[in-house]
Amino acid sequence: CQHCNHAPCETVCPVAATSHGRQGQNQMAYNRCVGTRYCANNCPYKVRRFNWFNYPNNSEFDFNMNDDLGKMVLNPDVTVRSRGVMEKCSMCIQMTQKTILDAKLKGEEIEDGMFQTACSNACTTGAMVFGDLNDKKSKVAALHQDDRMYHLLEHVGTKPNVMYHVKVRNTDEV
């Protein structure tokens, strides 16, 4: 998901299951989704997927996954979606909210690098960076100013919040 500022998937949802959050993430209320798939049809990036499986109680899964004890290993902050709803990357909204709440409870400012998504946390090369574009001192804001930065399908006008860098090529002639 590109977490667009002008997300075409948000406007077509008949039950308002998709909305735009304060941090710029495109969020879903999974318990509100009725699975019309309009959002998937309207997404120019084709990143939304329909959940065909019944994950909470599926006999195809290992016994331990359907056991009450086995279900306790799942992340309690992430909703286990039921069959018949649309799914997409949430940009780890639960981790973003936890970071904000923890800083608020401690009375601290949120510093650059405190926000982490699962993919950026797992990326050992540092190729994935997550942060606040409004903080001019942040690493992600500096990367945003780089001439090599681009957005996918910019001409569509969705104003995505996910950025990419062009591959570095040696342009010096011998």
Regions found by a protein language model. Give the residues of each.
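Non-ligating segments of multi-cofactor redox enzymes
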Residues: Q2-V174
